[in-house]
Amino acid sequence: MLILRMKKNYPVLIFLLFLAIVSVFYNYDEIIFLRPQSIHKWRQSDNASLALNYYQNGMHFFSPETHNLTSDGGTSGKCCPSEIPVFYYFIALLYKLFGYHDSIFRLLNTLIFLLGIFYLFRIFRYFLTDVFWSIALALLFFTSPVLVYYGNNFLSNSSSFAFSIIGWYYFFRFAEESENKWFYVSMLLFLIAAASKVTALFSVFAIAGMYFFEITGLTQFAKGQKLFQSKIRIPASMISIVAIVGSWILFASYYNQKHGCTYFSTTIFPVWDLTGDEIVGVLEGIRNLWLEQYFHASVLVFLSIC
């Protein structure tokens, strides 16, 4: 029985083995014990500070603050980020259980990120069924310098990205199996992702677009039946996610105004506010500074061909 189970799960075991080997190759096992540093170290420190302040100052969820005294005329650190600080609060709870160690923050962020890569493998496995390509394509994403660097960092972006991947896995299962429970699981995961980083709402917007196209009869996603069967619960769940995240952003704006905090940005910086020269400058920055940090040129060519 054990041998049969191992044969059935050998693709998962092989992938996890490769994932562990690559993680060690990237020195994840050593980096976990480092404090915030290098690129984006100021925002890393902000996140670490938010978690530590919860731990030190009473676990008041709606009173986030940092150690940087930029609020209330330079007398407090009360400042609220645009993301819902559930992640930082949970880190503070772990500090309560195990004591304050920065490695806890990095370790949790790393585990969530690697879980996201694992679910990316599951997505490929679900659709391709080919073991080699499922493993290879999932690990290919793990060659991105940007993902590798932020994957075990103090920023919540990588965790948000991971929860989005997991959410899409369950949405695909909903689409293929017509099981509504998978839709609601995916919505819960997208909520967690958007709570960690508001840009994760794009996943919800994409699904809302699918819903709109189907109910208006512009297209059909399921054979012989509608993909979105419920006319109330499905749109209500998507609206609820946007409402929860939007409500927090409004609260964050109010909280920051109340305490005179301008440290965190709780607004948008749309492209239409830029001049033509500024837009060209951004595109030049992407081409000259960042493009190869996303993926090696050979990978970009491969993805373009695909």
Where do the language-model regions lie?
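Transmembrane signal-anchor helices characteristic of membrane glycosylation enzymes that use polyprenol
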Residues: Y10-Q44, S49-L52, G58-M59, I239-Y255
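Extracytoplasmic catalytic/substrate-binding loops of multi-pass membrane glycan-assembly enzymes
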Residues: Y26-L50, G58-T70, K78-F90, Y100-S103, ...
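Transmembrane-lumen/periplasm boundary regions of multi-pass, lipid-linked membrane glycan transferases
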Residues: D46-Y54, I192, V204-F221, Q225-C306
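Membrane-interface alpha helices of multi-pass inner-membrane proteins
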Residues: T75, A138, F183-V198, V204-G209
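Transmembrane-helix signature of polytopic, membrane-embedded enzymes
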Residues: Y100-S103, L120-T143, F161-A162, K181
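Transmembrane-helix motifs of polytopic, lipid-linked glycan transferases
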Residues: I104-L128, I165-Y170, C306
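Membrane-interface transmembrane helices that cradle and orient dolichyl/undecaprenyl
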Residues: R125-F132, G167-F183, A193
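Short acidic/glycine- and proline-prone juxtamembrane loop motifs at membrane-interface regions
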Residues: Y149-S160
